[in-house]
């Protein structure tokens, strides 16, 4: 890491002293409260005494020389001490006087006068009756001889005495002795290194006595002066405080120390400690301080939020403040505010602020805690911070964490900027991590190729010099640590040997053919006959004055100007030789057009960069150069900046009086922009140039023979027909009040599923219930389609008359809009049909991922014209182009089957024919509506959301059907548990509790527990409560032992409370069959 790098450029304004008003208001603001009665009374008293304090300060200031003189005469002998007092500079009157010379010269001549006082007659008279008028003289005190002490030491001593009095007056006006404490404590040790400290104590006592002598008739003023003078004496006598050391838990952090005076001068940050003996209100204040530190606001006051159980425990002493902080940082509220919206790096930074009161110190520290949060999440990070030795050293078990910012302890330089930003109230609004970005990007990488005051790299040269904006939305600044010694890389336009950095003598050399054309004006009336300047070259001269003028406009303005913007008078003077090219350039740069273009509308920094490029022909080198022009612009204005550039030595050496400025140096990005040729494009700059070649498929597809019109039309008509473009998709919209649109959608569903409009063929209103539910929004289009597939009409028309393979073809046609893909899909659905029936087959189609992706919940299936795989397209065409009632030929067997390598020679045809009927499910429509069909139908998931009563009733019926193994939606009255149903409807119990009580009830015992052996009961419980069969014999043995020892209810509770049940069903989901083999 570079020692010159720093973590940003946040401006810090350390507080130098405390005042009564600011300290009181700051303390209330830190605690997020209004001023208390005592604080208001203290402020009122202070402001009421304001006039008196100002009067005291004015009196002491006017008589400061007299007071200092008495103190100096008390400790110095053998000369006039006041002659060494340096007076503050005063404004001199504008009148002719003789120069007084310096003080030493005046002392020799005897022309210097001093204000000295030894107290007057009455004061001397008092001193006769008071042996020690100014206080007890410390032992070992001896007056100091002026001649031996020396002029330098005398000047320092008189200066110190004057400053002591000045500190006292400042503190009196501020109403807080903090100024005295900050500037006086520790000076005794410094003074004793040069001389004895007893004379200073005697002098301070004399300052106090002399100051009080001016307020003998004013008791209130005497009290105020005595109070602050006593503080001055006490603080001077006090020992030098030790520095505040910053804890250094690891070797990768910086070991720092903060002088105690900086800590005393900083704003007071109250520290809250939870003690058992505190009152209720004081404990509430401590808890609110913890909220402010962890959540960055008082959530009790702002949002009426609190963690009441934790508050009670910490108030009663059940948990310490350390545990209280730990649990707050793990609370759901903290996770929502400071964990979920951020990436892990930013979470670490915020957690450091909230728990340790600082930001991360190093890259190694960030890596350590990043590993912790990646492996264990937020709880592991909180535990690591709270259990760290640093937390114990700073806060212990009882102290609420606080911000350890500027003035509280020494601050590190490498994370300076990010840490100051982290302490701001707006820190949670920044999503981009700052610390790891600073450590990884700024310190381990070279400086970017950018302007030192730019906010990023310069991909275009018009972006240089942009001042850092005030980011209020998605802030992501990452400052680059450019020091004043950093110099930008500039490329010379011309021979590299003529660079002005390596070869300053070649600054006036022209670039020749390697650079821009140079325009010089050397054949004017005023210059003919004169000797050419050294280095002048006719080759690069321009005899046409108008060409030089046009080049000057192009260089200064970057474009041609309008006729009304031209400077006609200056052009005429240039043509007549009355004006040099240099002065003409100066006139153009000071014109209103130039000022409005490159000064008024831009940042000062950006304007200086533009002007520097236009007039001097190169960008600025760095901060040191641009700061000089910035200072000139701030003090003298725009015209002074132009004069400073044109009058510079570099301008004279590079262009002289007769050369138009030209572009001498460019940045690397500028060179790349000007040389985007094929051979010069780098891979990291631009795209790779590809040679244009005709693709191979175009070459191979080129027609070589002549084709007739019928042949062309035949080829055009191949493939997907126009019907795909003309297909109309019927979709249910959110507005279901349009009954005509709903009826149109229902008719489209009938035509898709039954391949005809079924209204003329229905004698009974078989689908009235489904239509009503769809119109009322109780079911979706997907459920409506599924209901049509379960109907008796569909079973009669498309299941009973056909073999299973034909049923699969028709099912994929009606519900997926295509033919079967391959034999694998046919075998899959054939197995479902053979084992579970038509309802399970339709449910598998409608519940498939393909159906959800293509049609979703609100779209009627339609013909999709699939083109992949290619073998499936002709099958779909044939399936759709033939009428269902024409024949029952199979379409899908067009797939070529793979012959096995080994054939069973002994297998007879009669044997194969014997198994033909075994692959068929029952051909009876009534049989499919019976027990087996209901038991094997695909699982439908019921979840209790509590939105309406009808949905809750469906959930209750589903529970009875699953747990009691009922095959009808009509639940017998003697099976119902009305008390449990009422509790579930009112939300007193969850679905999980309902299942637990139902499986433990007498009804379940009579049906599945009493009639069967234990092993069979365990199988029933697995199927009814977990939706699967036992996986291993060990599961049956484990629950057999539990049932034998504790009974049925214990087994039910063990299964319902298991992790598997919680994972798949949770609290609100009805158990459902999770395996296709269930019920076989």
UniProtKB/Swiss-Prot annotation:
Keywords on record: Antenna complex, Bile pigment, Chromophore, Electron transport, Lyase, Membrane, Photosynthesis, Phycobilisome, Repeat, Thylakoid, Transport
Compartments where located: Cellular thylakoid membrane
Source organism of the structure? Microchaete diplosiphon (Fremyella diplosiphon)
Task: Tell me the GO molecular function terms.
Answer: lyase activity
Region spans: Phycobilin-like loop: 77-144
Q: Which top EC class is given?
A: lyase
What is the protein name stated in its UniProt record?
A: Phycobiliprotein ApcE
Q: What is known about what this protein does?
A: This protein is postulated to act both as terminal energy acceptor (by its phycobilin-like domains) and as a linker polypeptide (by its repeats and arms) that stabilizes the phycobilisome core architecture. Has intrinsic bilin lyase activity.
UniProt-annotated stretches for the region Phycobilin-like 2: 145-237
Enzyme Commission numbers on file? 4.-.-.-
Question: Looking at the record, which segments are called Disordered?
Answer: 906-930
Q: How does it sit in the membrane?
A: Peripheral membrane protein
Describe, as the record does, how this protein assembles with itself and its partners.
Phycobilisomes of this organism are composed of a two cylinder core, from which six rods radiate. The core is mainly composed of allophycocyanin alpha and beta chains, and of three minor components: the allophycocyanin alpha-B chain, a 18.3 kDa polypeptide, and the anchor polypeptide L-CM.
